[in-house]
Amino acid sequence: MTTEKQPQRALIYSHDSFGLGHLRRCRAIAHALVDQNPSMSVIILSGSPIIGNFDFRRRVDFVRVPGVIKLRNGDYTSHSLDLDIEQTVAMRASIVRHTAEIFDPDLFIVDKEPLGLRGEVAETLEMLRQRGTPLVLGLRDVMDEPSLLATEWERKNVVPALEKLYDEIWVYGLPQICDPLAEINLPPEVRRKMVYTGYLEREGARGAPATEHAVPFDRPYLLVTPGGGGDGEAMMDWVLRAYEYDARPPYPALLVFGPFMQNEIQAEFAARVSRLRDVEAITFEANIEPLIQEAAGIVAMGGYNTFCEILTFDKPSLIIPRTVPRMEQFIRANRAQELGLVRMLADDGVRLARDMATALRHLPQQNRPSDVVVPGLLDGLPNVNRLARRLGNRGSQPIAAIAGGSA
């Protein structure tokens, strides 16, 4: 009988660009690893400018690299330094490599970008590969419109890295919802590295740190959240116009603008909120779980993390997905609606107030996600832990056997 060796140190690269998604996903994984492995320590590498706003468990820490911003046209620029993007990436790559050299992880998980931003993780992957460190690429359930992703990965020469460097590809979702690499021409040996873990269940309200903001209503309310908020103004405007249109809404609304919504847009929305009896707003809440727990329904754009929270807290939800610059949210929301997990209201560009008002009136009476039986839907974190433990004992049975098989 083989004794499983537990990794003692995990290093997680959080691809930071636009919004909160990558950081919050990596944080959830880090917390799950230390919760189940008492000797585990985890470092998250991130350039997020607000990573310090989040609480981290004991034995989880972060190294912040110089931040970058992904512009709406897809280009990147330095967040705050007066450096061009090439210099910024060179600094980031050096910090990533040096951290890996000193920390010497037993497991390296790279989030979303196989080679990191502009290839900044490539040298670190090569170095750790030579040391025998297990290397894992973690992917969300939906990446982008398949044809666009195929073109992007071909341009970045990703497939050879998947062949030569990575031991496993963990997909934080289920194949019946989406295969994120469906139209990528992957060699069979790369396909065999793919494992679907299920979605990443979030901390229940009891286990989460206390929210900084008290619930402002003494009756059921709708929580409206665009995630990071950098591209959430259209959804927020639509919801506000619905409340301006409907003088007697059945439920009040709590709006969470998000830390990346532009200040002038927040100020404009806040002025409109002040004129509405049944709407309150806050800028940001790092520990949003208690607010979700108390809500009668959720209105969101349907990013990966919000979708996981909707499933975790079993909330009736209305999803208004963006379609630019990626189709990720639309693909996820459309498939989830087909399964009966959520309802989607597509942004037609007109955004009639009465359409939103009608959808909001019906929202709390919608089915909950738990009304649909999807085996393994929220098994992501237990499977991540099992996979991590097995990777600590290289040479044992194939990893794919642990979490339900390969793609």
Role assignments for model-derived ranges:
Residues A30, R202-G297, G349:
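Donor-nucleotide binding loops and adjacent catalytic segments primarily
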Residues T3, R354-A407:
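C-terminal amphipathic helix plus adjacent low-complexity
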Residues P7-R9, S14, A32-Q87, M91-A93:
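Conserved nucleotide-sugar phosphate-binding/catalytic loop shared by glycosyltransferases and other
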Residues L139-A234, F260-N263:
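A nucleotide-sugar donor-handling region in carbohydrate enzymes
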Residues S14-R27, I51, G232-E233:
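A short, glycine/small-residue-rich beta-strand->loop->alpha-helix junction that serves as a flexible
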Residues V96-R118:
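Short N-terminal targeting/anchoring amphipathic segment
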Residues N287-I331:
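A donor-sugar binding/catalytic signature common to diverse glycosyltransferases
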